[in-house]
Structures are given as structure tokens and as C-alpha cells.
């Protein structure tokens, strides 16, 4: 009897010791989290939204396994601001990032990477950064200059253990170089793109935007070929790290942001189309293959079931490109639907069976509160004015409407307020307000402002309250 009591005491002791050592539960039980955001991909540029030209089989398949988010919005109609919203849950104007190549991620902001790192996650960022300069020693990209630290803000300042990224855009093939001359007869140019230069033995020079993987550490080796493959090579190295820790990765490929460059392999997939379409569609298919490669790795290594993956674009398609906004009005840089509504899906096989379309408004500012809620870490949501909300109950099928409206603004003075049904918009500075019923008129063709002035007035009051809140944040009043 004494021996049995001793054994039971030892079992109880070691059980209690385990609980004391890991009061919040094993970090290995936490899901991996991946946020993929591509660049300038229009709502209509993917098969999952009905495009029959562009080949995106991997994106289509992943969307079919999860939730297709058919009313998903970027927080802004351009690049940098949307990126800021993804990792803070806040409108980018609150932190002084009103447009591309303006402002930078502030140290006072609390990012999703910082929060999950404290929860035991390994954190990595890959691809485009666009939230600050990455060097103070050499000329780089749009704003990096020797001796200039005014916008120096690298991922490791904001919770990332590892990173491999550029300040801004690069060509979508052979990202570090550009040809000395372009085939202008085919419409090639430095701005819009070209066929892979080295395939034709063209003379080349540095493009002028570099990849960085540490403080003043440029990556110059193994930088040839498909840009998204180069990025994914680094992602997979990161994922091969400590197997006992969950990972959080933001993967932001540059495709199909200009200049679009495609190799012969991908151009030939679209031989029946124009040269511009071959470059544009080819770059998207190349990117799609690499996202498929990522998921295949996760399945092969047994990580896929417990990985939460989100996919979206940072804004609508660029003007004067083959990009498609689908049935929606206007494109990038506009607060009409075509500038903000983007292709998106989410899957987490272990938790959600998926296979559904969710026709509920969501946007990139929802990422932070939603992910922390799904991790059962709502208490870690920053006590700052957030513009996003947790959409966990929508994903779980408990509610089918958005409870918190979404505010939008752009540096040209445009502003907008969107709820479950209606959209109020002033499309540029001092322009009169327009009102659309997005449930019956998603293409924004019938302005209802004169028919429903009371709805417009109520939404205008809420929009103006929100704009005052954003202005207060921009003045630094959110920070101690």
C-alpha cells in the first residue's frame, strides 16, 4: 500500500510540475498562422472568382477547402496603407501612412508579430515590406538613401525574428535586374514590364531595389528566376526551423505589381493572348504555383491541418493593365468597389470544414483581432482604437452580418463608410456624397442619395465621427 501511495504521489507531482511549467498550454498545440498578400491582384484575376483566362489552380483549390471571402476589402486602395492595417488592426492613417511610399511603421504601434512572438511563435516576414526603408548605407528602392534614417523601419523592429524582403516593387522575374533596352513594338517598358531579359542574352543592369535579410545585410546569391520562387525558397527554410514552436509568417509576393516580367515557360501558356497579357497572366500563374508548393510542403510535413492560412490582395488591379476588377467599378487608387474589393479566402482544416462562400463584409484590419480571438487570446488585443473586428463568429456560422462598419479614406480626399448593406462615398476631396445599396447594386451604378437621404445622413454622421478619431490618432494621442 505504501508503494502504491508513493507512485501516486510521484504521478501527481510530475503532473503538477508540467502544468506549472506551461500555464498557458503547449505552444506546439497552437496553430501555425500564414498571411499571404499579393500585390495589385484584382478581384477578377483568379479562377475562384470566375476568371477563365488566368490559370490559378492552386489558389482555386485552397479556396475550395476553406472559406471564399467574396466581400473582402483591402483597408486602402494602395499598397503601404493596406500592409499597415494587416499587422495592426488599425486604419493606416492613424499611424501616418496615408499612401504608398509615405510614412513608416512606428515603434509605438503594436503589431500582430510582436504579440504572437510573446505567445511562443517564431515569426518571419517575406517579400515586399513597404512599411519603411531597409538601409541607411546605400541607395535602395524608392526612399533608401545613405545617411537617411528618417523612415528606417525594418521588420525586426516590429516583432519579426527573420525576414527576407524589399522596400518596394521589383520585377516579377530576375528581380534584381532590368534590360538596357526594351521591345517597345510589343509595348515593353521599364514601367509595365518585359520578357525575361537573360533568355535573349540582352544586356542588363541593376534594377536598384535590393532584398535584405538582416541589418544592412543584402542577399545577392541565388536571386535568378521567378521572384515568387525566390521568396518561397526563403519561406521554406524558415519553416524548417524549430519543429516544436508554431510559426507566424507574413508572405507578401510582389506579383502582379508592375513591372510584370515572365519567362518563356509561362508566356507560352498564354500564347493566344497579347504580349501584355502573356506577361501579366504568366506572372500570376508562376505565383500560383509557388503558393501550391507551400501548401504541398505543409501537407508533406504534417503541418497543414493545424495551419491557419489567409490570402488576399493589397488593393484592386493597376490601371492600363490586363488586370480585372470583375464586375466592380474602377480600380487601384479608388474607393469604389474595384479599388478595394479583392480576392480572398481563409482555411484552417483542423477547425473549419470549409467549402463555403461567405458573402459578409470583412477587411484587412480584421486580421489582428480575428486571429487573436481564434487563438483564444482576446486579452492580448491592443488597447488602442482598432478599426477591425473579430469575424470569428461569422466563420463559425453564429452570425451572418457584420456588426461594425468599415471606414476608408485616401490621400486624394476620398472617404467612404461601408456597412452590411450600404456604402456612402465621397470619391474625391469636396465631392458630393453618393449612396449605394451593395446588396442589389455591387457595381455602384444607382446612386440612392436623393432617394434615401436619411440613410445617407446617418452614415455621414458616423463617418465624420470616425474621421475625427483617425485625426486624433494621427496627432499621436493614442500613445502614452
Positions of PLM-derived features:
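Formylglycine-dependent sulfatase
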Residues: 2, 16-433, 438-480
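Bacterial N-terminal signal peptides
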Residues: 5-13
Amino acid at each position: 500500500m505504501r508503494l502504491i501511495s508513493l507512485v501516486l504521489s510521484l504521478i501527481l507531482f510530475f503532473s503538477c510540475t508540467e502544468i506549472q511549467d506551461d500555464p498557458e498550454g503547449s505552444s506546439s498545440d497552437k496553430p501555425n498562422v500564414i498571411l499571404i498578400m499579393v500585390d495589385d491582384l484584382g478581384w477578377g484575376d483568379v479562377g475562384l472568382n470566375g476568371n477563365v483566362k488566368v490559370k490559378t489552380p492552386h489558389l482555386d483549390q485552397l479556396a475550395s477547402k476553406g472559406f471564399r471571402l467574396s466581400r473582402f476589402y483591402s483597408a486602402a486602395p494602395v499598397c503601404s496603407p493596406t500592409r499597415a492595417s494587416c499587422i495592426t488592426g488599425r486604419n493606416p492613417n492613424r499611424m501616418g501612412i496615408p499612401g504608398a511610399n509615405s510614412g513608416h511603421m512606428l515603434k509605438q504601434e503594436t503589431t500582430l508579430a510582436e504579440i504572437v512572438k510573446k505567445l511562443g511563435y517564431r515569426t518571419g516576414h517575406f517579400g515586399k515590406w513597404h512599411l519603411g526603408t531597409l538601409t541607411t548605407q546605400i541607395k535602395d528602392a524608392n526612399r533608401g538613401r545613405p545617411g537617411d534614417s528618417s523612415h528606417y523601419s525594418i521588420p525586426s523592429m516590429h516583432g519579426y525574428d527573420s525576414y527576407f524582403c524589399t522596400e518596394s516593387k521589383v520585377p516579377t522575374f530576375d528581380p534584381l535586374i532590368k534590360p538596357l533596352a526594351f521591345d517597345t513594338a510589343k509595348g515593353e517598358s521599364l514601367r509595365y514590364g518585359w520578357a525575361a531579359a537573360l533568355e535573349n542574352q540582352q544586356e542588363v543592369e541593376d534594377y536598384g531595389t535590393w532584398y535584405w535579410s538582416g541589418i544592412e545585410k543584402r542577399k545577392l546569391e541565388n536571386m535568378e528566376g521567378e521572384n515568387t520562387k525566390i521568396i518561397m525558397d526563403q519561406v521554406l527554410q524558415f519553416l524548417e526551423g524549430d519543429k516544436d514552436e508554431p510559426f507566424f509568417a507574413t508572405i507578401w509576393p510582389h506579383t502582379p505589381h508592375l513591372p510584370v516580367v515572365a519567362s518563356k515557360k509561362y508566356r507560352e501558356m498564354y500564347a493566344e493572348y497579347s504580349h501584355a497579357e502573356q506577361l501579366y497572366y504568366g506572372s500570376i500563374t508562376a505565383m500560383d504555383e509557388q503558393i501550391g508548393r507551400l501548401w504541398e510542403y505543409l501537407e508533406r510535413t504534417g503541418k497543414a491541418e493545424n495551419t491557419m492560412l489567409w490570402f488576399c490582395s493589397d488593393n484592386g488591379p493597376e490601371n492600363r493593365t490586363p488586370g480585372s476588377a470583375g464586375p466592380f467599378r474602377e480600380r487601384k487608387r479608388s474607393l469604389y468597389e474595384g479599388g478595394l474589393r479583392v480576392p480572398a479566402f481563409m482555411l484552417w482544416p483542423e477547425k473549419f470544414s470549409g467549402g463555403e462562400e461567405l458573402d459578409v463584409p470583412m477587411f484587412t484590419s480584421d486580421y489582428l483581432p480575428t486571429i487573436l480571438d481564434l487563438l483564444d487570446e482576446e486579452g492580448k488585443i491592443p488597447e488602442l482604437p482598432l478599426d477591425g473586428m473579430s469575424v470569428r463568429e461569422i466563420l463559425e456560422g453564429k452570425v451572418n452580418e457584420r456588426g461594425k462598419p468599415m471606414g476608408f479614406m485616401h490621400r486624394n480626399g476620398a472617404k467612404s463608410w461601408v456597412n452590411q448593406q450600404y456604402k456612402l462615398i465621397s470619391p474625391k476631396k469636396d465631392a458630393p456624397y453618393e449612396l449605394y445599396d451593395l446588396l442589389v447594386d455591387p457595381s455602384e451604378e444607382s446612386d440612392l442619395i436623393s432617394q434615401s437621404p436619411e440613410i445617407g445622413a446617418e452614415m455621414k454622421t458616423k463617418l465624420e465621427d470616425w474621421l475625427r478619431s483617425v485625426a486624433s490618432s494621427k496627432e499621436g494621442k493614442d500613445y502614452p
